[in-house]
Amino acid sequence: MGNPFMHVELHTNDVKRAREFYSKLFDWKLQDMPMPGGGTYTMIEVGTGTGGGMAINQAPGTPSHWMAYVGVEDVRASTKKAKDLGAKVVVDVMEVGDYGTMSVLTDPTGAAIALWQQKGHK
């Protein structure tokens, strides 16, 4: 079976402006959640389909951008396989609270993508 897109995330330099724009453009339910260590993460609930979130961009000098998360059974093995195929690891495998495990890569063309293993898999 294929690896579905599980989550999309907006890393923005202006959360307030992004919230205003997307809440008017789409019928999304936006819910703020406190993040460990401070700050706010906004969950995006879309009803049917892949949901997501938005947060302040953590990479100084990087333009606002969307990040796609692809579901994998084993994030460590998939990260290693991607690296063997020429990807660069931007964010190494890390736990995300009680939700799951992730990594962020750039493919051989320079495009960023995140791998996501839901908690309870493997």
PLM segments and residue spans:
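Core segments of cupin and vicinal oxygen chelate
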Residues: G2, E9-G49, V96
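Vicinal oxygen chelate
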Residues: N3-M6, L10, Q31-P34, T79-K122
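A generic structural signal for ordered secondary structure
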Residues: V46-G47, G53-A55, Y69, L85, ...
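Short, well-ordered beta-strand micro-motif
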Residues: M43-E45, G71, V104
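Conserved short beta-strand elements that form part of the metal-binding/catalytic scaffold
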Residues: W28-P63, P108, A112-Q117
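Short, low-complexity cationic-aromatic patches
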Residues: M1-G2, L10, D14, M54-P63, ...
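Mid-chain, well-packed structural core segment of small domains
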Residues: S64-K83
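Short beta-strand micro-motifs in enzyme catalytic cores
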Residues: T40-T42, W66, T101-S103
